[in-house]
A protein has these predicted regions:
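M16 family metallopeptidases and their MPP-like homologs
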Residues: 1-23, 27-79, 90-99, 104-135, ...
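A common structural junction motif
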Residues: 75-82, 174-176
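An aromatic/glycine/proline-enriched structural segment found at the starts
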Residues: 155-176
Length: 176
């Protein structure tokens, strides 16, 4: 997908909650708590972000858990649940954070400066307005992210203590 560039200019898609909604929502058959229990003892992790021109899953692991890490990322890629509870938590906590950020000159500039520099394009604001938070819907976010991920190109980057052969094999087994 094209990340921020896929979003409408009015900022109506709650991209601010994407990382939390996607990873903390767990998988289709496993909540985050259940997933953590299943993976206890393994060193794997996952993150999700909306970049300016991409959506990105990321993870950090150790060599002995590399294959499991790839399986986890592939599972999020194909079956992220985006449950409503993490989305509700970020919606309830973000207005207070906005007040704190806006209380400083640098914070106010960050919140309002980027949209002004981009002709009012709210996609480039680092955080939403309170009104956007209030009207944000998880289903809207999910629709845009799912479409972008399912129709966009996939780029996989692996860095660390893993051979090229092991990386190719793990990608082939998980992402195809």
């Amino acid at each position: 997908g094209n990340g921020t560039l896929d979003l409408p200019k009015d900022g109506s898609v709650p991209a601010f909650a994407a990382g939390t909604a996607v990873t903390e929502g767990g998988l289709g058959k496993l909540t985050l708590s259940q997933l953590e229990q299943v993976l206890a003892g393994d060193v794997v992790g996952s993150s999700f972000s909306v970049g300016q021109d991409s959506y990105a899953y990321g993870g950090t692991t150790r060599p002995e858990d590399f294959e499991l890490q790839m399986q986890l990322l592939a599972a999020y890629f194909t079956d992220a649940a985006s449950r409503p509870e993490p989305f509700a938590v970020i919606k309830s906590s973000l207005p207070t954070q906005l007040d704190q950020i806006r209380a400083t000159p640098g914070g106010a500039l960050a919140l309002d400066g980027f949209p002004m520099l981009s002709s009012g394009d709210r996609r480039f604001a680092p955080l939403p307005t309170k009104e956007q938070i209030e009207t944000a819907e998880l289903s809207t976010l999910r629709q845009v992210v799912d479409t972008g991920i399912s129709q966009g190109p996939i780029e996989i980057t692996i860095v660390g203590d893993v051979t090229v052969e092991a990386a190719i094999e793990a990608v082939g087994e998980t992402f195809g």
